[in-house]
Amino acid sequence: MPQSLTLLPQRVLAVAVVITALALAALITLATGQPYVGLTLAIDQDRVVVLGSTAGLDVAPGTEVRGLRSGGTELPLAPVDLTPEPDMAFVRYSDMDAFFERQRARSALLRSGEAWLQLADGRELSLPVTQSRPLRDLPFVFWFQLFCAAGGLLAGASVLAFRWQDPSTRYYALTGTGMLLFAGAASVYSTRELALDGRLFMALSSINEFGALLFC
């Protein structure tokens, strides 16, 4: 057997490992590079409520949130704004575009460095905004999706490396690539804290959709 063919499995696996490592590093960088306030929100029927705060805010769990403010800019916060997967929440493209625009506005407000949390009881709490999210704050779901993304690509590459002439293994490797794309993209936007830049969110959502098509 020619030496080039003998070395093919090692080459395929090496390339797959490098691609996976670079992709994971990029996703972690994106996830931690967002404004952070140490606040966990949740949906309670038709309300947005506080679950907890790691920043020592004087707010009890279950307190209803109305929105964010910075200077003269006030941005209301609705339950739909917390949806982890916009593709499942909106039917019309115009609604999704409006969602991305609200994300952009909130992200810009938080990046301004001064933000206030508006509560339904009329109080406003100053948010201690930092421009990066601590690695320890990333939830289990984020890491699980990264595990799925990496596992998909490496599993596909492992089969392709040893049976690269079989068309079915090439298709299997393609589905693994799709898993890397859709699970990796979703890991960033589905576990965001308060907001993600709208353009980045839109790009990640498109990558997620493309990856899902490859996977199917």
Label every model-predicted segment:
Residues 1-35:
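Interdomain regulatory linker/hinge segments that flank or connect interaction modules
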Residues 137-159, 163-216:
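Individual alpha-helical transmembrane segments in multi-pass integral membrane proteins
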Residues 62-65, 115-117, 164:
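Terminal peptide-recognition signature
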Residues 46, 113-115, 123-125:
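Envelope-exposed proteins and targeting segments
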Residues 30-81:
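PDZ/PDZ-like domain segments forming the peptide/carboxylate-binding groove
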Residues 118-143:
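Short, aromatic-rich amphipathic segments at membrane interfaces
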Residues 68-115:
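PDZ domains, with a preference for the canonical peptide-binding region formed by the helix
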